[in-house]
Amino acid sequence: MTTHTTFPKALIVEAVPDILSRITSILRGYPDIELAFLFGSFAGGTVTAESDVDIAILCRQTPSFDRREEIRAALCAGMKREVDLVDLNGASPILRMQVLKKGIIVIDNASVYEDFFVRTTGEYDDLKRVRKGIEESILRGGIGGAHA
């Protein structure tokens, strides 16, 4: 049986600067990382004893599997906690938008951020329009359903 302990919000708020500092220190060793965000439970204040650290990175070029694992291993060692590392180069518009909305910037590059923001919001808006059309069609019974 696993028990989930939610830490008091005050402890999380006090710990966030230390967490951000450690993440920044580790990621500065990887000059190909142009943007990085802390997101998920640590950014949202819902950390439990079992929570991993969710970090999203944007590199100049899509990092290889080995490179991502190297970065993730360095973060795990430095954070002394499991890290879920997301490559924003290959992430869905939905995940990228969640990172933009709820994430905390750890590594910032203003021009790269602006390009990432414009691309992500554009793709997300396109996806919402397509999804809305599909949902309306399904409700009318138009996709695989009986037509009224």
PLM features: residue spans?
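Short edge beta-strands and adjacent turn/loop segments
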Residues: 39-51
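Short beta-strand->loop micro-motif that forms the acidic, two-metal-ion catalytic signature
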Residues: 54-57
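Catalytic core of pol beta-like nucleotidyltransferases
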Residues: 1-35, 43-45, 60-148
